[in-house]
């Protein structure tokens, strides 16, 4: 049934053809079940394990690796002799890497898919219905409830479907619907129609929503919608329809993979074509096909050399280390790539309640009457410190602490706060914090009584558990609460009837009243001045109301409560307590005592964090279900808006936003910093508009209502105290619910991206070097300088360790003073590409040079000529060109060992170069990252391992080197540091300014 909130109760009953007293007939139930289906959210069609595994191989880099592994595998089949074992090492290792990566990926995805299932926990198990086949109420499974059913709900029940209230069987009906609307206090419901067809959920005061909880009272209603038709069902549909986009990093790596694959394909084809003339060389036994296969193997080796196999693993490790660092700062990251996305966040959309504020209502101002002189009324105004439920804070007058017990008016005010109250404080020993038991507003009054301590109770030696209600207990021992007149919408107040605890006390019975100021003050005939009561006159009333108006608007926007006493209430037996319409009569002839102003105060550290965001070029938008006045006031308090800034086109309610034409809605999202009275759909819409401007949006939320927007935003941030649905739809959970933690996480994200750039570039310049090396040997016709298994070892192990250690580079000092980087910024700019080509060219030439040096000049080398070396394929016993040369020398392990040692040593020098993109090693010495120094030591140790520990030299086709060779290795390798220093100097002085 659409728009049930706008119809009368009679229209709703007529729509389903049902009577409130008897309910649906079995025949109607059957028809409705066929028409509307069961009252449950359908199970999500998750991806099968096989689909998830296949998805992990959609990455281009991974596919190229897979192809290389398959080809290597096929070629290994045709190997003969002792090479067979080593030939299988390469495809086997590549496959192992791919499998490990896929496992990590599948595990991440599986976690993400649990989001929609978590909604199930808000589906109630049972419901109480009236049906024609039974005289009394019956309990049935919630899934069997159908539209048109007459349902009964009472305090503590979970609402089983979206229900239009027909009758309220108690004084009031309060519902906690914070999971759905984000309202911080429970909502009072009624039965009258709400004529606005476009009312937001917060304004549908005659509806109960599926999954919300009844906080007080009892009611009967008719089911309007079930299952997917309910508000919580609509949220599920939104979540199911939201596809996760790739993170900026994933997009970058995909682009990079594409470029790499094109370059690799070109080089492989080029190497193969260059050598067509050598296919018939004697070394291949004169067989053209064997020659073709030989050069095909070299092309595959090239592909292996060009792909940074270690890159996926190093990125995963770096992100995982980043998540650990963030967890220490209370930010728990659920999906690894989002760690880096945080670094380019340009807009943070934050919930107000609990994130920017403490979600702990507290009284911050109060006043009592000081004296009345004719028409002149003077007030005593006090402010109260402390912004949580902890009973710690001071009462200040003119910014100086005062003892509340000195003021008779404050003693009475504290008495009313303590007695006209059903809530209390509780010290949670596991969390180590004070928590509310009951209503937020009432708990604020309980906390105020503890801070005031009007009877100077000795509290210093009490334990935290005893301290929670110490001062309230003293007041409750003096007066005994007889009964409560519950809050009702018509009089907007509640009261308690109290008698003195000691029978011969000087005071008689009293009624203490608290409620909305305008309602209570209208029923006050007197005001309390000290211990006397003075008649309430027009000017006095005006003065009181003007202060309340001032507190309720402007910067403070406090929620004010008036407190009053009826000094001589009627006798108890004269009062009719089961008729709430009479309560107004009993709460008349009141004496006004004072007013308290409370708010959900901003967290202390938020203001500094907002300033940090401003410096870092990040816009903060507050989004809340609260009303606009409160929202703007909090924005001014925390620095989103200036004190006197005109916010005409920078703050909107959900309704105002909807009324704008589409083009203006887009513009509003570009400018605005505050949205109030919003619904879940608004949040998703705002994210969509921001994304259309290429903004990277972080969205916070804690309720079920926030889940679609959390899923849609690039970074969904859930609160630690939030619902399971919000947590599972998000990328990050704030353990302490604190906005400042987001800012710390953004800083960490930026540092991670910078470090990631460094190690990606480090690995790539290494691969460029390997490619140049293989290309040169093939183009010049030299013997192989490096074989695939050696390249794999370098790419995975020797390069992998320093690359991972580069993830520990300290963040730049000005990291939060720069604007967010644009997601479109390339990983490697033109100048950097030139730099890697230059360094890579040197690496390749040095590696080939080291191998050639052994053939041409080494003491223990064969001293062949350059011509013999470049035509070694033609070498045979009978060739006059190779007289006195043993052809087997061209397959000796020494030149390969020289080449590999130079490659590894240069890579270690390169790792030092990568400490900073443009800073000289003189300014940023190696020991700023001690992990890097350690990893270089470890990499060199592993290199010595494959040189000097049997049987490794045989597997890797290497030979032990002596000091003479090592000195040559250093001479060839160290110049790379000088070369990079020159390039950094150019970048610093000619390109950065």
UniProtKB/Swiss-Prot annotation:
Taxonomic lineage per UniProt?
A: Eukaryota, Metazoa, Chordata, Craniata, Vertebrata
Binding sites annotated in the UniProt record for Ca(2+) 1: 304-305, 307, 309, 795, 799
- UniProt xrefs under NCBIfam families: ATPase-IIA1_Ca, ATPase_P-type
Task: List the protein's name.
Answer: Sarcoplasmic/endoplasmic reticulum calcium ATPase 1
Q: Which residues cross the membrane?
A: 49-69, 90-110, 254-273, 296-313, 757-776, 787-807, 828-850, 897-916, 930-948, 964-984
Q: Which gene encodes it?
A: ATP2A1
Q: What Gene3D superfamilies is this protein classified in?
A: Calcium-transporting ATPase, cytoplasmic domain N, Calcium-transporting ATPase, cytoplasmic transduction domain A, Calcium-transporting ATPase, transmembrane domain, HAD superfamily/HAD-like
| Organism of provenance | Bos taurus
Membrane topology listed for this record: Multi-pass membrane protein
- Quaternary state and interactors: Interacts with sarcolipin (SLN). Interacts with phospholamban (PLN). Interacts with myoregulin (MRLN). Interacts with DWORF. Interacts with VMP1.
Residues on the membrane's Lumenal side span 70-89, 274-295, 777-786, 851-896, 949-963
* Record-listed Mg(2+) binding positions: 351, 353, 702
Q: Which residues carry this modification: Phosphoserine?
A: 580
* SS bond partners: 875-887
Enzyme Commission number(s) of this protein: 7.2.2.10
EC top class, as a word = translocase
Describe tissue expression.
Detected in fast-twitch skeletal muscle (at protein level).
């Amino acid at each position: 049934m659409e728009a049930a909130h706008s119809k009368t109760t009679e229209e709703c009953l007529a729509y389903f053809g049902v009577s409130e007293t008897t309910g649906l007939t079995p025949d109607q139930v059957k028809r409705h079940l066929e028409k509307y289906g069961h009252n449950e959210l359908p199970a999500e069609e998750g991806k099968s394990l096989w689909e998830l595994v296949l998805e992990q191989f959609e990455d281009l880099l991974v596919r190229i690796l897979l192809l290389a592994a398959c080809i290597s595998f096929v070629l290994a089949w045709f190997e003969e002799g002792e090479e067979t074992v080593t030939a299988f090492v390469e495809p086997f290792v590549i496959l192992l890497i791919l499998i490990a990566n896929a496992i990590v990926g599948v595990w991440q995805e599986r976690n993400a898919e649990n989001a929609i299932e978590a909604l199930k926990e808000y589906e109630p198990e049972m419901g109480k219905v009236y049906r024609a086949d039974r005289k009394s109420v019956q309990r049935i499974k919630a899934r069997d409830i159908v539209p048109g059913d007459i349902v009964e709900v009472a305090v503590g029940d979970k609402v089983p479907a979206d229900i239009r209230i027909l009758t309220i069987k108690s004084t009031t009906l309060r519902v906690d619907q914070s999971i759905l609307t984000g309202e911080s206090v429970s909502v009072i419901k009624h039965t009258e129609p709400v004529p606005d067809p476009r009312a937001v959920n917060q304004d549908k005061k005659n509806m109960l929503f599926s999954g919300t909880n009844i906080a007080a009272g009892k009611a009967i209603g008719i089911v309007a919608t079930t299952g997917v038709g309910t508000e919580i069902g609509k949220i599920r549909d939104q979540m199911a329809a939201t596809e996760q986009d790739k993170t900026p990093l994933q997009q970058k790596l995909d682009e990079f993979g594409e470029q790499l694959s094109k370059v690799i394909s070109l080089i492989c084809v080029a190497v193969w074509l260059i050598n067509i003339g050598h296919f018939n060389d004697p070394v291949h036994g004169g067989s053209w096909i064997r020659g073709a296969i030989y050069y095909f193997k070299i092309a595959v080796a090239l592909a292996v050399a060009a792909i940074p196999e270690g890159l996926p693993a190093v990125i995963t490790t770096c992100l995982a280390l980043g998540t650990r660092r963030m967890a220490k700062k209370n930010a728990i990251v659920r999906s690894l790539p989002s760690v880096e996305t945080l670094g380019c966040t340009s807009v943070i959309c934050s919930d107000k309640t609990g994130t920017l504020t403490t979600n702990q209502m507290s009284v911050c101002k109060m006043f009592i009457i000081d004296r009345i002189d004719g028409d002149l009324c003077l007030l005593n105004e006090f402010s109260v410190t402390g912004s949580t439920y902890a009973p710690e804070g001071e009462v200040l007058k003119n910014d100086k602490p005062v003892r509340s017990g000195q003021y008779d008016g404050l003693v009475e005010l504290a008495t009313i706060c303590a007695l006209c109250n059903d809530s209390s404080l509780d010290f949670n020993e596991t969390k180590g914090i004070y928590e509310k038991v009951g209503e937020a507003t009432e708990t604020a009054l309980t906390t105020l009584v503890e801070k005031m301590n009007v009877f100077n109770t000795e509290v210093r030696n009490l334990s935290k558990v005893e301290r929670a209600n110490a001062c309230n207990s003293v007041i409750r021992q003096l007066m005994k609460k007889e009964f409560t007149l519950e809050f009702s919408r018509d009089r907007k107040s509640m009261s308690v009837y109290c008698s003195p605890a000691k029978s011969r006390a000087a005071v008689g019975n009293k009624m203490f009243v608290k409620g909305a100021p305008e309602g209570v003050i209208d029923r006050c005939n007197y005001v309390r001045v000290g211990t006397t009561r003075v008649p309430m006159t027009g000017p006095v009333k005006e003065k009181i109301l003007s202060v309340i108006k001032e507190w309720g608007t402007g910067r403070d926007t406090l929620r004010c409560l008036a407190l009053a006493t009826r000094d001589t209430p009627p006798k108890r037996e004269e009062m009719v307590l089961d008729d709430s319409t009479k309560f107004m009569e009993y709460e008349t002839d009141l004496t006004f005592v004072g007013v308290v102003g409370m708010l959900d105060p901003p967290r202390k550290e938020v203001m500094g964090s907002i300033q940090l965001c401003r410096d870092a070029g990040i816009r903060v938008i507050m989004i809340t279900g609260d009303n606009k006045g409160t929202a703007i006031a909090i924005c001014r308090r925390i620095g989103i808006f200036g004190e006197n800034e005109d916010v005409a086109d920078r703050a909107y309610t959900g309704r105002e936003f909807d009324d704008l034409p589409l083009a203006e809605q887009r513009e509003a999202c570009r400018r605005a910093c505050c949205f109030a009275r919003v619904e879940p759909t608004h949040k998703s819409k705002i994210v969509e508009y921001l994304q259309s401007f290429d903004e990277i949006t972080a969205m916070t939320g804690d309720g079920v209502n926030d889940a679609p927007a959390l899923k849609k935003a690039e970074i969904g941030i859930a609160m630690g105290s939030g619902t399971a649905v919000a947590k599972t739809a998000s990328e990050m959970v704030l353990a302490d619910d604190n906005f400042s933690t987001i800012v710390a996480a953004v800083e960490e994200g930026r540092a991670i991206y910078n470090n990631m750039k460094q190690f990606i570039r480090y690995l790539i310049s290494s691969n460029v070097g390997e490619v140049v090396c293989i290309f040169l040997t093939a183009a010049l016709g030299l013997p192989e300088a490096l074989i695939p298994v050696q390249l794999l070892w370098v790419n995975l192990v020797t390069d992998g360790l320093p690359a991972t250690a580069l993830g520990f580079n300290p963040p730049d000092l000005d990291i939060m003073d720069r604007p967010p980087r644009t997601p479109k910024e390339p990983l490697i700019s033109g100048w950097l590409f030139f730099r890697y080509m230059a360094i890579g060219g040197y690496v390749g030439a040095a590696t080939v040079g080291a191998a050639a040096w052994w053939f041409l000049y080494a003491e223990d080398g064969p001293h062949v000529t350059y011509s013999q070396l470049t035509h070694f394929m033609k070498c045979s016993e009978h060739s006059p060109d190779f007289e006195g040369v043993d052809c087997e020398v061209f397959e000796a392990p020494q030149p390969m060992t020289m080449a590999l040692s130079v490659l590894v040593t240069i890579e270690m020098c390169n790792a030092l170069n990568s400490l900073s993109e443009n800073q000289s090693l003189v300014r940023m010495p190696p020991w700023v990252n001690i992990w890097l120094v350690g990893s270089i030591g470890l990499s060199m140790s592993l290199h010595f391992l494959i040189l000097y520990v049997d049987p490794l030299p045989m597997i890797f086709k290497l030979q032990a080197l002596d000091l003479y060779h090592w000195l040559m290795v250093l001479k060839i390798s160290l110049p790379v540091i000088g070369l990079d220093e020159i390039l950094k100097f150019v970048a610093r002085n000619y390109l950065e300014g």
